[in-house]
Amino acid sequence: VKVMETGSISIAAELLFITQPAVTKRIHSLEDYFGVKLFESAGRGIQPTHAAHSLLPKVKTWLNELGEIHHTLSHEQTQVQGRLKIGTSHHIGLHHLAEPLKKFVQLFPQVTLDVHFVDSEQAHEQVLAGELELAFLTLPPAGDDRLSYVTIWNDPLVFVSAPFHPLAKQTQLNLEDLIAYPSLLPAAQTYTSQITLSEFEKNGLKPKITMSNNPLESIRMLVSIGLGWSVLPKTFLNEDLKQLDLNLKMNRQLGMVWHPARIQSRAAEELIQLM
């Protein structure tokens, strides 16, 4: 599964904390067992065969079921232990999670915390698919009825530019003023971008998007050198950014999501309670 997800034996080995020869040996063992070729050489890399693509969804289902068996058995133990696989957006991981996770690992030293930095939208899908037990992310404007959400942090969004940008010198701006200048927004599928674009759509407007980028830290740098205006969390403001004088309040909700229909490990339950 890891080799198919990454397209690389070496990267898969790093993620699994084993050697490349060990990964190759396991692949050959699977090929011998099933009597089919799972990967073929392609230049300097490898590519999965049709058989591998056919096998992948069944393997993922089996891994999810195996994980639920582990979670069920964890409730029979008095000690909270085992591996807890969680996801977090880069922004939340860098700005909000350090202290809570530090407290968690001190309270439950027998738990191996497996933290994956992913985009909020990707984390949402991985929780839905059972690939993550729990994720910390920007909550979607419209949630999925199959998942449970808890808002933890309110994250105000502000319009920003470089201090020397023409918009920074103006007062009482409106959205019409902004569309005359290039904007730097997150990719259209991101929740932050959806929140921003919906405000323009309400007014029948469309911003002039010259560049879409992720993560937000990259956008902050591009804005600071004068390439355009953007919408960023208010916590990003510093001497390199100027909040634009626009009478419009926008917020995004940051929190956690999990799948209530799946059996939660005791470690996941404890982290949910801690948060």
Give the positions of each predicted feature.
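Beta-alpha-beta core module
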Residues: 144-151, 155, 217-263
